UniProtKB/Swiss-Prot annotation:
Designated gene of the protein: hldE
Protein name: Bifunctional protein HldE
SUPFAM superfamilies: Nucleotidylyl transferase, Ribokinase-like
Upper lineage: Bacteria, Pseudomonadati, Pseudomonadota, Betaproteobacteria, Nitrosomonadales
Active site residues per record: D277
Residue segments, region Cytidylyltransferase: 359-488
Keywords in alphabetical order: ATP-binding, Carbohydrate metabolism, Kinase, Multifunctional enzyme, Nucleotide-binding, Nucleotidyltransferase, Transferase
Keyword Flavoprotein carried by entry: no
Any one GO molecular-function label of the UniProt entry: ATP binding
Catalysis: reaction(s): D-glycero-beta-D-manno-heptose 7-phosphate + ATP = D-glycero-beta-D-manno-heptose 1,7-bisphosphate + ADP + H(+); D-glycero-beta-D-manno-heptose 1-phosphate + ATP + H(+) = ADP-D-glycero-beta-D-manno-heptose + diphosphate
Subunit details: Homodimer.
């Protein structure tokens, strides 16, 4: 299962000519970060000393950001104001490569902006700037015209991201669903409100547990009644599926074959903001690239488990999803054997934790005690050891046609089992200089049979403040000696 997910992400996300249209309530999320050390003398409220601020895509714009993070071409349709916040939001969308030509800029309403004030990681207050009234006839016509133009280019799928802020009226939803159905384009909806009739005929809905309970008029804690009512809702709305997101409990999917539940990946939850956006974006991306429904939902479940471990509205990205899938694929090997994107995501995470990155490289054919001792010593020069491993082709080029004895995947698997090794990446080039420049390690480790000026990447690592560490080799221990002994 994980292999098919990885294949889809690595070879299709961002490579296939697939694009997805997102329609809905576009928002700007603004975060003001500070520290709280005292209470105001003017009123019994905390004083937040502002340290930094950040602006991120929110609402339907965050759905687009998640798609872009997965490498999916994205177009956005919605309504924003003609204000500074609109310029900021458009800039964020342009930065991620999203197509904004179908966004209508209205002089009659502000850009929806949610400003959150945080002391440490604790949200103290949220300030909302919005006009949630229904669109005017002029705004509605402008948006419908823009969406019709987008549909002529046949998106692989359409996402309706409804935050009940006036954009997705029943008229607009039914118009989009009818046009999409006639063209064989799936429509997935992240719904809002108590009346889901405006989504009638959509492909699928992804409400959370509370939203499902409200729409079905049942108690959220009564699972049996909730699922029965949800299935009736699916049937009434003529949906292919209804996927109920349940936070730390995972996702329950109801379709024509019945119901199934996917448990969430256990992890610490910091912030659920935007998790629903990640679910519908990843689910739609998976379906658009040919994954079966339950596989696409499982992939979305994994992606949501990643983003809830972050503070604020932060979209998923392809590299960290690949890393998580590799981690789940095998506790021993795939957790450590990386491609470059996954490795860079992991290195970035280590750096954020203040850890020093050590890099070493070699063939490591017929692993022996000398190798193990060397790798332990290399790891001790920093906090994390990344091992660049020569592919079979490059080993043959260096050592001759009779080498390597052990296949590259087997060598990687054995090295990944060592506690001293934190990541293994194969490289096919004559030297690892491109890999070194990408990783930018703090330390390059090499055997003491080299001099510093002979170490590939030594000058580069010194140029960014790192160092070269020469590790004593164990006398008499080498793969060549082992091969000669076996031959005799």
């Amino acid at each position: 299962m994980r292999e098919s997910f990885l294949d889809t992400i690595q070879h299709h996300f961002g490579h296939d000519p697939v694009w997805i249209l997102v329609v809905g309530d576009l928002m700007l999320d603004r975060y003001l970060f500070g520290d709280v050390q005292r209470i105001s003398p003017e009123a019994p409220v905390p004083v937040v000393l502002l340290k930094s601020q950040d602006e991120r895509a929110g609402g339907a714009a965050n759905v687009a950001a998640n798609l872009a993070g997965l490498g999916i071409k994205t177009r956005i349709a919605g309504v924003i104001g003609q204000d500074a916040e609109a310029e900021t939001l458009l800039g964020l969308m342009h930065d991620i490569g999203a197509d904004t030509q179908h966004i209508h800029c209205s002089a009659c309403r502000p850009t929806i902006t949610k400003t959150r004030i945080l002391g440490g990681h604790q949200q103290m207050m949220r300030l909302d700037q919005e006009d949630a009234a229904a669109l005017s006839a002029e705004e509605q016509l402008a948006l419908q015209t823009a969406i019709a133009a987008a549909l002529t280019d046949r998106p692989a799928a359409i996402i309706l991201s409804d935050y009940a802020k006036g954009v997705l009226s029943e008229t607009l939803c039914q118009s989009i669903i009818a046009q999409a159905t006639a063209s064989g384009i799936p429509v997935l909806v992240d719904p809002k409100g108590r009346d889901y009739s405006k989504y009638h005929g959509a492909t699928g809905l992804t409400p959370n547990k509370r939203e499902t309970a409200e729409a079905c008029h049942v108690a959220p804690h009564d699972d049996q009644a909730l699922l029965a009512a949800a299935e009736q809702l699916r049937h009434t709305l003529k949906l292919d599926f209804l996927a109920v997101t349940r936070g730390e409990e995972g996702i329950t999917v109801l379709d024509r074959q019945g119901s199934a539940h996917l448990a969430a990946t256990a992890r610490q939850v910091y912030d659920v903001s935007g998790a629903g956006d990640t679910v519908i974006a990843t689910l739609t991306a998976g379906l658009a690239h040919g994954l079966p429904l339950h596989d696409a939902i499982e992939l979305a479940n994994i992606a949501a488990g990643i983003v809830v471990g972050k503070v604020g509205t932060v979209p998923i990205n392809k590299a960290e999803l690949e890393q998580e899938l590799q981690s789940q694929q095998s506790a021993a090997q795939a957790d450590k054997v990386c491609n470059l994107d996954s490795l860079l995501a992991r290195v970035q995470n280590w750096r954020h934790q203040g850890e020093r990155i050590v890099f070493t490289n070699g063939c490591f054919d017929l692993l022996h005690a000398g190798h193990v001792t060397y790798l332990e010593a290399a790891r001790n020069t920093g906090d994390r050891l990344v091992l660049g491993l020569n592919t079979d082709r490059s080993v043959s080029a260096l050592k001759g046609p009779s080498r390597p004895v052990i296949h590259e995947q087997d060598r990687a698997r054995v090295l990944a089992a060592l506690e001293s090794v934190d990541a293994v990446i194969l490289f096919d080039e004559d030297t690892p200089i491109d890999l070194i420049n990408a990783i930018r390690p703090d330390v390059i480790a090499k055997g003491s049979d080299y001099t510093e000026d002979q170490v590939v990447g030594g000058a580069e690592v010194k140029s960014w403040g790192g160092k070269v560490a020469l590790i004593d080799v164990v006398p008499g221990r080498s793969t060549s000696n082992i091969i000669r002994k076996l031959a005799s």
